[in-house]
Amino acid sequence: MGQKVNPNGFRVGVIRDWQAKWYADKDFSKFLAEDIKIREFIAKQLTDASVSTVEIERAANRVNISIHTAKPGMVIGKGGSEVEKLRNQLNQLTGKRVHINIVEIKKPDLEAKLVGENIAAQLEGRVAFRRAMKQAMQRSMRSGAKGIKTQVAGRLNGADMSRVERYSEGKVPLHTLRADVDYAWVEARTTYGQLGVKTWIYRGEILPEVKDAKKNSKEQGGK
């Protein structure tokens, strides 16, 4: 049987960038474990803040963290109180100077992780899985997605035997490297056990010249 490679990792270095940007020789394992700790801590603290990705950059004794969220107001808090509290907690966790940058997600319905979390939340709230999946897919297509595929696996509707249900709309080219496909896997904890929710969203093609133009404009903006 043909196995599916993770679409995010498959495109790293082609149209996707790394989520951890640092180099280490001897301390690689220590930094990697620290990255995992940081990501888990942020996920735990910002459960309801619709966080899609966390990017980590390192320089000397400084850690720069970019949090991509659909609810920046919730992360920042009144007068920046919440983000300052989070920064202090991360300072203690890592023992380094932490700088946090909040990036707003303009279209949350085009982020696979957020769509998956939405489906999972509905499944936990006892909404019928077909309805939850189809509503999420319709919202994504209305937001401008070229295609979407969703999959739910487990004891659906409390059935004795677990099974897998898939629905798709539009096209999702998994082996075209220039295709901007976002993928995420999320768990839904229901009274009947855990369900796995997978989401693939195709957002169009990223052509090399477009990518280079974006890179050049960023470099010019930084000068």
Swiss-Prot record:
Gene3D superfamilies: 3.30.300.20, Ribosomal protein S3, C-terminal domain. The keyword rRNA-binding applies. GO terms for cellular component: cytosolic small ribosomal subunit. Signal peptide: none annotated. GO terms for molecular function: mRNA binding; rRNA binding; structural constituent of ribosome. Keywords: Ribonucleoprotein, Ribosomal protein, RNA-binding, rRNA-binding. Belongs to the universal ribosomal protein uS3 family. Part of the 30S ribosomal subunit. Forms a tight complex with proteins S10 and S14. Binds the lower part of the 30S subunit head. Binds mRNA in the 70S ribosome, positioning it for translation. This is Small ribosomal subunit protein uS3. The gene is rpsC.
